[in-house]
């Protein structure tokens, strides 16, 4: 490389052209003589990786052929070098700018030829695919089969259920041990089983496993590490006579007795929770609060006794959580052993396994790490705010060599936006955006992109009005949250092509009116008829699918980009599941009766045995896809958009099963029962999806639906548990699953940790809503629940009269 480049960190707000800037960097490297095979560009989705390659080829072709494009590139890079203080690079590009256009274009032609000749060695892909390449490249050294492959999501769900079985077997045949495992994973403090126990068990274990890998050496449920100064102790006070209670507090002693008998799994009444809320004052001997809607003061021994009972309750729940955390740590350790055995035997990996294997078994092994070090000289990392600690741990030893380069011959370039860090729930850590450069600040240049090329000026004005730090201060958000948000705020300026453009409005609706309102908006705007795009964003897949059904009934074409179990959809999904059951067991009368009464009744018109025989024959000749196409040929779905889309989903299920290597109809029946369909985009259709799924996309009309209900809160600081946390005290690193808010508030160390949970929740929700609002190109509509007036709020059930739980 003829001149030096700097390491570069770019902070890019939504719609400001980070892909453009990243491909500029790749073109720059190519024009400076870097071989394509020495460049590594990583992002998080295959779609984004494909976009990189497409934009790169377009940029090289334009520079090679279009008048003035090569000169514009050199001038752009010259100005950027000047702004960054890179004088040598600025002089280099100034000389390029002065050269004849024919010579400028020739440089681009040479770079384009170099890329096309070496296209198969150009590494532009996802972070997961790169980690997989690392693992597969050293499979023999890792004790893995060379045919190692990554499970797709449907196959991974089957794998996880089998892993649970292996884990239970490893823990022993004792029924009590198995019952304890189940209680730990799905019972929790509330004693309430989730709607889908298996999926809940898997999620709980996966979170424990992730932290177990990220926190090596931490003590799980270590009381000494978490509470180095010890926990507050319950006072030794005899029960008083309760003769001098405030007026209207006659049943206060009943609430004290309730708490004395309560423990993990107990649902506390609102009255009993008053003891927790006022525990500090009660323990001190004086507390003033409202009980039975009567304000009063409790003092002396009655107060101290109530405080000691509340403290005893807190101690019981903390002890239970510590024990449960210790068991979760043991499960995570045993789970790692189970996975190692299974992957060495079958060569099947999850995406979540890749960072751990790459870190522990590849980059930490000197011989293997040395072989990796020479792979790439220039690293370009996209969407860096979504990188997890475990992923970075796998890359860091390799990138460390890049940081050490003082000659400018090897570089790191990373881009991100901490305002769009919406994947913390799966391990993404926005703090890495600044942390990884600590110690190398002198070698790193910073660049900010704040000019939006996506959104109309009026849309950006709304974004600023809601999200700029001053607005958050006016809204009285936690000052620590505002300070953290301010660090990542880069502002938003509209490009001149979007000045005075855009439309923003708010519509109020809740319940059944939400989707009627959305349908009206789409029909009024007529964006689809004009060839534009419409995105409707929700917070959950379930709500998106609910909307898809209603909007389809309104005559609108809809596709859902989230994932949903096909077998629960409309009348067709369950009918296909019954068909699979009958193909497996023709003697199943219940399945036969259900099939005759449903959408696939014509398929069994000639009898059950002919149907089963035909299904097996179709499976033998065309796999699961051929079999389900045979079933669907008997269904009358023509003209019904919803059913046509659902039929396509059923076919995708068959195709996915065939690709997973499944070999029998019985296996397909199990597979189909658990299959989560990724959906498909339809031209001229409303694209319904979760906000998470919309990341990286843009729509001419964006409708954001924020709904209440079903456990969903519109509060920014909503902290739905459980929270498995890690930290450090002078006594060492620890891991603990936090108890409920009320219990945490009674213990200083846990109160501080729960406060951090709340701050993280606020930041995560700010990021989520920022992503939602910045998807809009021309029009943004927010559909929100009506604001309840004071009179409406007064009708709500009082906190004392409601049930609570700690």
Roles of regions detected by a PLM:
Residues 190, 195, 686, 694-731, ...:
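Long, charged, helix-prone linker segments
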Residues 714-756:
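Conserved catalytic motifs of ABC-family nucleotide-binding domains
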């Amino acid at each position: 490389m003829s001149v030096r480049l700097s390491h570069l960190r770019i902070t890019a707000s939504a719609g400001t052209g980070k892909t453009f800037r990243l491909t500029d960097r790749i073109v720059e490297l190519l024009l400076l003589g870097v071989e394509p095979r020495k460049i590594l560009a990583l992002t998080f989705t295959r779609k984004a990786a494909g976009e990189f390659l497409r934009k790169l080829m377009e940029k090289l072709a334009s520079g090679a052929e279009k008048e003035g494009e090569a000169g514009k590139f050199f001038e752009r890079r010259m100005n950027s070098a000047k702004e960054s203080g890179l004088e040598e690079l600025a002089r280099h590009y100034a000389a390029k700018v002065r050269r004849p256009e024919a010579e400028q274009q020739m440089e681009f032609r040479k770079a384009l030829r170099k890329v096309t000749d070496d296209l198969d060695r150009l590494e532009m892909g996802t972070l997961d695919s790169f980690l997989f390449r690392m693992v597969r490249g050293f499979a023999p050294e890792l004790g893995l089969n060379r045919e190692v492959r990554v499970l797709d999501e449907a196959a991974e769900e089957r794998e996880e259920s089998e892993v649970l079985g292996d884990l239970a077997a490893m823990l022993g045949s004792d029924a009590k041990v198995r019952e304890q495992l189940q209680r730990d994973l799905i019972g929790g403090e509330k004693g309430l089983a989730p709607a889908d126990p298996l999926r809940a068990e898997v999620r709980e274990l996966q979170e424990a496993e992730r932290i177990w890998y990220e926190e090596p050496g931490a003590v799980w449920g270590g009381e000494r590490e978490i509470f180095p100064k010890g926990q507050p102790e319950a006072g030794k006070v005899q029960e008083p006579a309760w003769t001098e209670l405030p007026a209207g507090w006659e049943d206060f002693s009943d609430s004290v007795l309730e708490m004395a008998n309560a423990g993990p799994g107990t649902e506390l009444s609102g009255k009993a929770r008053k003891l927790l809320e006022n525990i500090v004052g009660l323990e001190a001997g004086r507390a003033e609060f409202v009980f039975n809607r009567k304000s009063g003061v409790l003092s002396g021994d009655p107060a101290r006794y109530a405080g000691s009972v509340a403290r005893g309750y807190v101690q019981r729940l903390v002890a239970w959580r510590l024990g449960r955390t210790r068991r979760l740590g043991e499960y995570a350790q045993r789970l790692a052993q189970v996975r190692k055995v299974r992957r060495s035997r079958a060569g099947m990996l999850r995406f979540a396994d890749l960072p751990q294997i790459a870190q522990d078994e590849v980059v930490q092994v000197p011989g293997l790490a040395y072989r990796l070090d020479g792979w790439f000289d220039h690293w370009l990392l996209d969407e860096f705010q979504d990188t997890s600690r475990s992923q970075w741990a796998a890359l860091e030893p390799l990138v460390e060599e890049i940081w050490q380069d003082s000659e400018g011959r090897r570089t790191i370039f990373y881009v991100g936006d901490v305002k769009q860090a919406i994947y913390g729930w799966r391990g993404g850590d926005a703090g890495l955006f600044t942390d990884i450069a600590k110690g190398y600040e002198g070698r790193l240049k910073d660049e900010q992109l704040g000019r939006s090329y996506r959104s109309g000026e009026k849309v950006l004005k709304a974004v600023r009005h809601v999200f700029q730090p001053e607005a958050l201060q006016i809204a009285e958000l936690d000052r620590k949250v505002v300070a953290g948000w301010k660090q990542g705020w880069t502002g938003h300026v509209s490009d001149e092509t979007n000045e005075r453009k855009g439309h923003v409005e708010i519509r109020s609706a809740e319940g059944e009116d939400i989707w009627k309102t959305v349908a009206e908006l789409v029909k009024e705007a007529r964006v689809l008829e004009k060839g534009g795009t419409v995105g409707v964003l929700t917070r959950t897949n379930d709500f998106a699918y609910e909307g898809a059904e209603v909007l389809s009934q309104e005559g609108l074409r809809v596709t859902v980009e989230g994932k949903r179990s096909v077998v629960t959809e409309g009348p067709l999904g369950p009918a296909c599941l019954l068909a699979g059951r009958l193909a497996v067991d023709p003697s199943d009368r219940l399945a036969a009766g259900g099939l005759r009464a449903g959408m696939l009744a014509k398929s069994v018109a000639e009898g059950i045995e002919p149907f089963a025989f035909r299904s097996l024959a179709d499976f033998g000749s065309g796999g699961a896809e051929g079999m389900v196409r045979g079933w669907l040929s008997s269904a009358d779905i023509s003209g019904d958009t919803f059913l046509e889309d659902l039929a396509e989903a059923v076919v995708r299920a068959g195709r996915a099963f065939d690709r997973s290597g499944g070999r029998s109809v019985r296996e397909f029946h199990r597979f189909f029962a658990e299959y989560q369909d990724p959906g498909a985009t339809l031209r001229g259709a409303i694209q319904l999806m979760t906000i998470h799924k919309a990341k990286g996309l843009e729509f001419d009309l964006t409708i954001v639906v924020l709904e209440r209900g079903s456990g969903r809160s519109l509060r920014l600081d909503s902290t739905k548990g459980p929270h498995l946390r890690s930290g450090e005290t002078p006594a060492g690193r620890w891991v603990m699953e936090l108890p409920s808010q009320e219990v945490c508030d009674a213990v200083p160390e846990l109160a501080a940790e729960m406060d951090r949970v709340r701050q993280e929740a606020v930041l995560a929700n700010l990021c989520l809503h920022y992503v939602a609002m910045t998807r809009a190109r021309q029009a943004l509509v927010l559909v929100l629940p009506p604001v309840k007036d004071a009179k409406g709020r007064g009708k709500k059930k009082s906190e004392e009269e409601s049930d609570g739980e700690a």
